[in-house]
Amino acid sequence: LYSLMNRVEGFSLERGFAPMEDMEKLMRENNIPMFSLESKTPLKEFDVVGFSLSYEMCYPNVLNALDLAGIPVRREERGEEYPLIMAGGTCMMNPVPMERFLDFIVIGDGEEVMVEIAKILVAYKDKTKMERLQLIEGLDGVYVPVLHKGKKRIKRAIVADLNNTEYYEDQIVPYINIVHDRATVEIQRGCSRGCRFCQAGIVYRPVRERSLEKNLELIEKMIKKTGYGEVSLSSLSSSDYSKIDELIKGVKSKNAHRNLGVSLPSLRMNTHSVE
């Protein structure tokens, strides 16, 4: 999303991170509000502040981050001088626990709908919050609590064809060591297994594969742009990808001169082959 939305003319997306307790203590003691990583701009000076929520335990982080940024936590307490507050991610499949704090919520895949939201925000920057929310509400996957009133069922945003969706081949490369210190390509989305314990297997339905040719193309571009020596073939169950053998062989063949490593997360034992 960082790459896709920053390609929208007139729109700038910056990152921010909730601090640990010791840093938060120092920020509060020195009256330092939460700010963005790129330009060090205070969050309350942006037009929109968004949160990506993967787990329910992240909910308090949102409220604390807003408070640290000097932004009222409750939606009805925020006037025109404050940014719109939104959230997305797997935990927003059920937005009700957080709806009193958020202006709008994105439910489902974000690649397409977030770009459309960015275009609306740029085109109607001078409109009131309510006018912008009314325009955003018309998009698939967008839930605006103050406008909804139970009048319709929200249709989850789904990227139907991964091959026709722009991908972030210009992946951000950090200058410190991180846990997943490698290029990452999502080879497929969704899972056909339907294990009852797995939230992601339900949330990311239906199963959609990116073609062998497209995956190889993305990997080639990403390695050239990032300089990584390893690539992760990411999905909920990588060994269920229909052409996993051909993909691995293709990656190794095209990158033999680079000695590129291949990482395969989330493998099922019953789909392993000798090869």
What are these regions (language model features)?
Residues 3-12, 253-255:
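Short helix-loop-beta junction
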Residues 5, 173-196, 223:
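N-terminal pre-triad scaffold of radical SAM enzymes
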Residues 10-22:
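A short beta-strand-loop structural module common to alpha/beta enzyme folds
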Residues 19-151:
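Glycine-rich beta-alpha loop elements in corrinoid/cobalamin-binding modules
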Residues 49, 103, 191, 195, ...:
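Conserved, mostly hydrophobic/aromatic
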Residues 57, 221-275:
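Conserved SAM/AdoMet-binding glycine-rich loop
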Residues 145-184:
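N-terminal [4Fe-4S]-dependent radical SAM core
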Residues 198-214:
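Iron-sulfur (Fe-S) cluster-binding segments and ferredoxin-like electron-carrier domains
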